[in-house]
Amino acid sequence: MGGINVKKRLSSATIWIVLLIVLFFAAITVLESSKTSGAISYNEFKKYWIENKVSRVEIKQDGRTVAGELNDKAKTQFQVVVPQSLLVQDILVNNPKSSVNVKFEPASSMPMWISWIPTIILILVMVGFWVMFMQQSQGGGGGNRGVMNFGKSRAKLATPDSQKVTFKDVAGADEEKGELEEIVDFLKEPKKYLDMGARIPKGILLVGPPGTGKTLLAKAVAGEAGVPFFSISGSDFVEMFVGVGASRVRDLFEQAKKNSPCIIFIDEIDAVGRQRGAGLGGGHDEREQTLNQLLVEMDGFGVNEGIILVAATNRPDILDKALLRPGRFDRQILVGAPDAKGREEVLKVHVRNKRLSDDVDLKVLAKRTPGFVGADLENLMNEAALLAVRANKKQIGMEELEEAITRVIAGPEKKSRVIHEEDRKITAYHEAGHAIVMKFSPHSDPVHEISIIPRGMAGGYTMHLPERDTSYMSKSKLKDEMVGLLGGRVAEQIIIGDISTGASNDIQRVSNIARKMVMEYGMSEKLGTITFGSDHDEVFIGREIGKSKNYSEEVAFEIDNEVKALVDEAYKKAEKILTEHIDKLHAVAKVLLDKEKVTGEEFNAIVEGRPLEELNKKENAIDLEKHDNVEEVHDDVEGVHDDVEGVNIKDTSEDNIETTDAFANNTDLEEDKKEI
């Protein structure tokens, strides 16, 4: 670092010195030009001379230039070029006034070459500036960031020795690792594949939601393969200059050929691989030119032996079909959200360098985080570690992990916010309404936690978690989901006798579920098993702006009626449940007003009519028994959870943790009030 700082200082000092030299010569030029100011014509000079207005003259070395001064009040300086044939006669012979001071400039004793020094220095300075500009334009010796290197690839080359990520650092994706391990094995031992006549895939596309570990898998491939690894982002290809993207693609593959066998990884390839179209302006698109060059390099007339292209995207629907065909991206690997077992394995990876207390159960934690991807779980463990440090604890406990889950989902608590008692009451009944309706809806998930403490933009929340990972949502479950979401609004109507803006998000989610049931899932008895509306964008304008409508206005009217019927049915069912269990609604709301937060076990005890004191005594007895059986805790627990091999993980679809918000701070409503 010291050497870099010294170089920076020397570079800045050189720049300042050069600037001072330039300013010096600029000042000399200005002074020289000022000396030549006041130039007059020969006729004017002759007129002044005859009229006795000249006080002194000085004849320069060249014998033609005459400088002088007028005898006016301003002592005006002048300079004139007089023909040599008239110089002696006009000034010396016809001198009208003997008092005029005539002076000859003496010949210079300085060698002529000295007068050339300023010009030589100025030329050297200009040459120096040109050299510095060329060095900067060529990237200063590296980085390919210079003006003259626009066409050079910006891919970063990672050598095998610099790769520290391996497949041991990737968990919860056994099938995905298996697909990529085959690529690694081919790079290490290509002979057995070639003898069998097999062709290794030229390209592998990693597809999946954000945070599932696509880039991490690519890094692991680089670490395991032991070959050069070029990594670049899709956005690095396209610049403001025409032809730069295609040039960079060519340069990237030229570099890869020199380092073959190797791997090229393009992250976020949708930035350059978006489906081609006419575009809004109808003109030529620089991105399309880049894509065309990429298509040619992947499978054209050229031969790219030993080069494997790995790309990642979370938008496979917008990629060009020519890019996805066999021979280019032969294999697409779906990197989805892990199931409960996969989440447990991911958690084991992320707790290697963390100190956990004995009460931490990663299996329980994995079950309580459905829908969490690898990035979410890493963030969860980091939040728990920060909470433990904030509380001055030596280890991370289950309490910190539970709080971290809620923080990741709903945001941090805002206990300091002053809330009016009437608002607390509305929030308590709103959340209690959600919980009671979910409790008595057979297809709803169990309630995990209820709180009226503000978090994020919400004034309270009701969290319910699924008992297991599911791949599908039945019609009955979707209907009960709508009933649970409307429980808060119905509770307000029954208890308060008025409704508020707190259920705005609930209503939005209910409307979305009902509309998807009718238009996408074919769950409408009246309209039948038909999908309404196109699920893809218009190809002509680049697949993102316009959607086609393939149904009539009459059908649109029926769709709206069916959506309204589903929502009304859910509202009536929620109203019936709360009316039948009004005593339980009051009981849960009362405890919420006292404690502000109720766990799932406490909620079940309240609904079943059991006193909370018995539940607390039971929990204290369990904690005491644990404390008696706990052995001495070692500070360093690194390596306890290292073994994550040999686990078979089933790939399931993503399940999201549902939280029903209550009383989100409706800033839009406040702005409307101000406008009124």
From Swiss-Prot:
State which Enzyme Commission number(s) the record gives: 3.4.24.-
Task: Kindly give the InterPro entries that the UniProt entry links to this protein.
Answer: AAA+_ATPase, AAA_lid_3, ATPase_AAA_core, ATPase_AAA_CS, FtsH, P-loop_NTPase, Pept_M41_FtsH_extracell, Peptidase_M41
Which cofactor is recorded for it?
Zn(2+)
Q: Name one GO cellular component term.
A: plasma membrane
Gene Ontology molecular-function annotations:
ATP binding; ATP hydrolysis activity; ATP-dependent peptidase activity; metalloendopeptidase activity; zinc ion binding
How does the record say this protein sits in the membrane? Multi-pass membrane protein
Cited PROSITE patterns = AAA
Q: Which residue spans belong to the Extracellular compartment?
A: 31-112
PANTHER family hit by this protein = ATP-DEPENDENT ZINC METALLOPROTEASE FTSH 1, CHLOROPLASTIC-RELATED, METALLOPROTEASE M41 FTSH
What is the annotated role of this protein in its UniProt record? Acts as a processive, ATP-dependent zinc metallopeptidase for both cytoplasmic and membrane proteins. Plays a role in the quality control of integral membrane proteins.
Q: Which family, according to UniProt?
A: In the central section; belongs to the AAA ATPase family. In the C-terminal section; belongs to the peptidase M41 family.
UniProt protein name: ATP-dependent zinc metalloprotease FtsH
Native species: Clostridium novyi (strain NT)
